[in-house]
Structures are given as C-alpha cells and as structure tokens.
C-alpha cells in the first residue's frame, strides 16, 4: 500500500551540492512507490522529480523560509494527511517532528554531518532535542551515526543509509570527451579531478599549497581540474575562493597546472569529466565541528571507474574502500598524499577500473530506495 510522505527540505537543485542531489534522489525514489508531497524553495520547482506534488516557499532569508515552512507543513498535514513527515536535513527537523507529534504521524530526519555536529547554542537548545524526539534518524555514514550517539540520539532510532549513485553511469560520450580534450588542450595531460564546493573543509587551497607542488615536480604534465565554486546560499560560511587558490598556486609557480571550470549542473558534462580523469582527489580537512558527512563524489568517481585519493576523515571512510576504489591517507599528511598520487599515476594497475565500478554498484539509487522503503515499512508496523 502506498504511503503518503511529506518531505520538507531547503536542499534541492538548482542549489549545488551533495545534500541537494541526495534530497532530489530521495524524493524521486520514494515517489516511485509512494505518494510524495515535496515542500521546498521556489527555485526548485522546475527541476523537482516529476512524480512529486511540489509546494513552494521562498529560499531566503532563512528565517522566512523556516517560518513559512512551519505554516505550510501544518496546512499540508491538515489537508493532505501524510502518513510520514521526512526532514531532508537537521535544519527542518523541528518543523517535521513538531507537526508529526501534533497530528500523531511518524517522523524521519536525515542527518548529514554538520547538521548534527554543530555546537551553535540555539541549535543545541531547539534543534537537537527535536532531532532526538524523531521516530527515526537516518545518518549518511558511520561517523555521522557516531556523532548522533554522542549527541544523545537513541541507538534504537538510528539507521545508516549512505547516499547513492546513478549506476550504471551514463555511457561514455567519446565525441564530447574529444571536444573537451581539444577545448582545454588535455591530450598530453594527466588529470586530477576535484569536484565540490570551495569551502574550508574541502581543503583545496591547502592541497594546492602542500601537495600539488611535489606532484608537479614529479609529473610536470599534471593538471588539476576543479569543478565547483564558492557557494552563495550555504549556511556554512567557512569558504575558500578561486582567487585564494590561484594566489597560492602563483606562490609555487604552478598556476598553469590548475584549471577551474566552475559549477556543472549537466550530468552528461560532469560524467565526461569523470571519464577523463586519471584520479579524483578529495583532500578534505578534519574539522571537529564541521565534518565531511559522506563524500558522494567519491562514489560517483568510482562508478565511472575513476579511483579516489582522500584523507581518512568523516564519512569518507565509508565512501572510499581503501585499496579497492582508492587510497585513504592519514589526516593532514600532505607528503603521503602527494606520494600516493604520484605512485598511483605511475602504476595505474594498483587501482583498477573494474573494482571501482563493482564497489560503486552497491550504492545504486535502487538500493537506497529499497532500504528507505523497508525502513518506512518497519516504522509503520
């Protein structure tokens, strides 16, 4: 029997990021077997999953979004009578849990890392108690679950459902890949790929400062391709910028080894870059109150047969299978990071394409849908 599910989230495309892609896919997958109402910001309407009933409110300012989400959730509960209320992140948890209690429905909160780890006083007073009161809390990784336990969330309420990936990936478009190679003069390059928003946590500036110079010294034809930009709507204001990173590169005389291509929302273009890359680099910094919740880009890279070199911090330890889909490096050990990149580029057989893709298969969105539906079924029994 189909369930009526209301998903309340601020994180949807065209905003760019892993949380946005995850929430879109959760809504899309659940709508295949349930009746899904989606409450989010107005800009998301045109890109929302086609089987969802979309309800819109303004994205900014944040307090207006939260107030209107609170009011509109009440109205949807009153008129549509959903069986389950689902918060797409900790941000909307108080709204979802409050109205679920009032209407005697079930509540689910999906947490990503920062939205449970933050030590903001208001968050500790209002948000954490409401997350604890949810009927079910889904963590995106083992480290995020561990943070939940430390924050007092009952182990009986906790489940881990990692973000998914489109598998099999889009087929290789050889003509478009050739166009990219010609446009950016890539034919004789070894390509390192970085995909993600330019924040302090992603650590790209530190990578350029402390690891890339040694890589360039040993492999002069290396090119670091950066997909992503400084986020404009992020609640996390610890940011980096293209200008900062290029200034750091200039200090080492390696600006010619970096290519910024900006944000890419077209999956076909992004897929081609994954196929083009020799390695995906993920030099995320360990910041105690700002953890990397999972690392969807590592799974996306693996699905295309591209291995990842990453620091072993946060949920990355769930996203990268060490010695299978990549190599995990001790946090902040930039010397080992650069040596591992050099060794892997010179010995590509140590991390082969087939192992990467086989490992990525278990993260398919189909598997995510199955696990979500099982959880919903258990919640209603």
Q: What spans do the regions from the language model cover?
A:
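Donor nucleotide-sugar binding/catalytic pocket of nucleotide-sugar-dependent glycosyltransferases
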Residues: 132-177, 186
